[in-house]
């Protein structure tokens, strides 16, 4: 793109795409600059991104109004894990075909992606749980046309909160059991 800069001092094997994008060093692929906020592998969500990991910005210096998450186990318990098979794009509702394939050329996708049992959630159901619990998070994203997407990695946060809540309950029960055992309580008989 215009103004792309691949000149990261002496860097090799780099790809830089987009207006004002700058190289980062050896073996980097950079797509866009700080203005790029979305990257689609395929508009219909059928694309697959292969990576060994992803890293998201989480630096305290770029955050404000930090508070403890108020929900955990109660939130997780309302979610419905499901298994499903993906539909072939030709079987999408017409409004989605119009959105993803405006030229009318609906692509056929290989069976290797559509014959595999998938596991996950229904984004509309998760959004309903968010509304019910007044949970402001960006786990569910809805685009301007009403297409729902989920950021599954963000579910880790309420899951960790749920684990913390369960751990606190277990510790309290363990203390109660220890107290009962130390008092040598006998039920239904004499010492």
Q: Model regions: which residues?
A:
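Acidic, glycine-rich loop-and-strand cores that form catalytic or ligand-binding grooves
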Residues: 72-112
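Glycine- and small/polar-enriched repetitive beta-structure motifs of secreted/surface proteins
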Residues: 1-53
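Stable alpha-helical elements in mature extracytoplasmic
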Residues: 72-75, 122, 159
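C-terminal intramolecular chaperone/auto-processing assembly modules
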Residues: 102-110, 132, 136-191
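Glycine-rich, acidic and aromatic/proline-enriched surface loops and short helix-turn segments
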Residues: 78-81, 123-136
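Residues that recognize and position ribonucleotide moieties
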Residues: 119-120, 148
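Glycine-rich, low-complexity segments
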Residues: 7, 37-68, 72-75, 172-191
């Amino acid at each position: 793109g215009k103004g792309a800069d691949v000149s990261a001092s002496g860097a090799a094997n780099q790809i830089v795409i987009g207006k004002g994008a700058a190289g980062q060093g050896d073996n980097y692929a950079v797509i866009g600059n700080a203005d790029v906020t979305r990257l689609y592998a395929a508009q219909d969500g059928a694309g697959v991104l292969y990576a060994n990991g992803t890293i998201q910005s989480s630096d305290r210096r770029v955050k404000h109004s930090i508070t403890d998450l108020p929900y955990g186990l109660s939130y997780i318990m309302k979610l419905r894990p499901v298994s499903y098979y993906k539909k072939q794009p030709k079987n999408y509702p017409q409004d989605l075909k119009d959105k993803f394939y405006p030229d009318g050329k609906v692509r056929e996708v290989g069976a290797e992606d559509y014959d595999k049992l998938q596991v996950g959630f229904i984004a509309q159901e998760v959004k309903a749980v968010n509304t019910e619990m007044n949970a402001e998070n960006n786990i569910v994203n809805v685009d301007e046309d009403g297409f729902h997407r989920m950021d599954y990695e963000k579910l880790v946060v309420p899951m960790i909160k749920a684990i913390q809540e369960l751990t606190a309950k277990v510790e309290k029960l363990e203390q109660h059991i220890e107290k009962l055992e130390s008092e040598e309580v006998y039920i239904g008989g004499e010492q």
